[in-house]
């Protein structure tokens, strides 16, 4: 007799726990979980009691967070698109990234920061769009104010980013606050850096009122910038991430290399050096770079020499459809023809050892 669908949901958390390593932020798996709020809250493995309480109490916020997971993972993949580790996700793994983030590396620091930022962004946006019962536009942005251009009236809908930060801190940090180990402190630091990054790009937008746009009266509001700005900023922080060690009393960090400055609240921190990600490695969670597309003319991280780790590359000849011979027609359209373009695609060779192909 076939088990009912509800029975499958009851077994799913236990099955995922058996099959995948424990990674702190199991709420990342909310991207792949559909159905009612009860199904989502009770069947995402690894949530602590505080997270489940918030999940049951605010199902609309959880839906926003779930949609936000897809956005910040896409941003992570954009930032790492030219690197050996490309922020690839594992759809059937409740940790979303597998074992790779078990290491306290730069990559872990970035993922925790961008995920925390993504929660702030998703909740704040949902507040402004009227999708959440617990918040709306920023209630503090009312009345008259002044800036370098003079007096203006607060109007429109200012993004309520303080609410987004408050909820993100309560939900995302809940599991880390239960632990007192070094990794929990690292995650909390990078989570906070991610939240602060979103607020950094809050900008004032204004609309002029008056005869012929004379701007005798201005109405202004605060709006978040596109999430790409946050991603670009955290990418720079990733490249300048600071390696740290725990201090003697185990309550904070000190720099691993005394020549470097102490990390600020905006910096990303990490404990362990990253693997090279060249070959498939179960323990490191690395998928390797065999089969990855590389750039023959680049001298950067996406070059065939760097991406392929010196193993060489294969070249295939492919054709693709592109737009060509585009012309502007008055008024107001651009019309193009479809053309076939021939090009060479270079992909990294596999290691000579056969064990690279064993699935993780």
From Swiss-Prot:
Compartments in which it is found: Secreted, Extracellular space, Extracellular matrix; Secreted
O-palmitoleoyl serine lipid attachment residues: 212
Natural source organism: Dasypus novemcinctus (Nine-banded armadillo)
Post-translational modification, as annotated: Palmitoleoylation is required for efficient binding to frizzled receptors. Depalmitoleoylation leads to Wnt signaling pathway inhibition.
PROSITE patterns per UniProt: WNT1
Signal peptide, first to last residue: 1-25
Identification of the protein by name: Protein Wnt-2
Similarity comment text for this entry: Belongs to the Wnt family.
């Amino acid at each position: 007799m076939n088990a009912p669908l509800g029975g499958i949901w009851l077994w799913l958390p236990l099955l995922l726990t058996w099959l995948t390593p424990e990674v702190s932020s199991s709420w990342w798996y909310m991207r792949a979980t559909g159905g009612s709020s009860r199904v989502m809250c009770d069947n995402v493995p690894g949530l602590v009691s505080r997270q489940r309480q918030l999940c049951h109490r605010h199902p609309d916020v959880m839906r926003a967070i779930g949609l936000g997971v897809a956005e910040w993972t896409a941003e992570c993949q954009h930032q790492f698109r030219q690197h050996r580790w490309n922020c690839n996700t594992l759809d059937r793994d409740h940790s979303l990234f597998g074992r790779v983030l078990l290491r306290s590396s730069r990559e872990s620091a970035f993922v925790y920061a961008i995920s925390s930022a993504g929660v702030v962004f998703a909740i704040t946006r949902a507040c402004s769009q009227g999708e959440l019962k617990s918040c709306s536009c920023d209630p503090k942005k009312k009345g008259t104010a002044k800036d370098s251009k003079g007096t203006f009236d607060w109007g429109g809908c200012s993004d309520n980013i303080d609410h987004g930060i408050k909820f993100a801190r309560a939900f995302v940090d809940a599991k880390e606050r239960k632990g007192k180990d070094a990794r929990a402190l690292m995650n909390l630091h990078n989570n906070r850096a991610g939240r602060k990054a979103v607020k950094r790009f809050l900008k004032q937008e204004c609309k002029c009122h008056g005869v012929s746009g004379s701007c005798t009266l201005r109405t202004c509001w605060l709006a978040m910038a596109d999430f790409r700005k946050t991603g670009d900023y955290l990418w720079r922080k990733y490249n300048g991430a600071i390696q740290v060690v725990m201090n003697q009393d185990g309550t904070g960090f000190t720099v691993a290399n005394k020549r470097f400055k102490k990390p600020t609240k905006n910096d990303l921190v990490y404990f362990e050096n990253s693997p090279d990600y060249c070959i498939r490695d179960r323990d490191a969670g690395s998928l390797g770079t065999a089969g990855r597309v590389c750039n023959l003319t680049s001298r950067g991280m996406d070059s065939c020499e760097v991406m392929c780790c010196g193993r060489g590359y294969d070249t295939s000849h492919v054709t693709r459809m592109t737009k060509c011979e585009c012309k502007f027609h008055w008024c107001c359209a651009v019309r193009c023809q479809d053309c076939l373009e021939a090009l060479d695609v270079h992909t990294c060779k596999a290691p000579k050892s056969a064990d690279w192909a064993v699935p993780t």
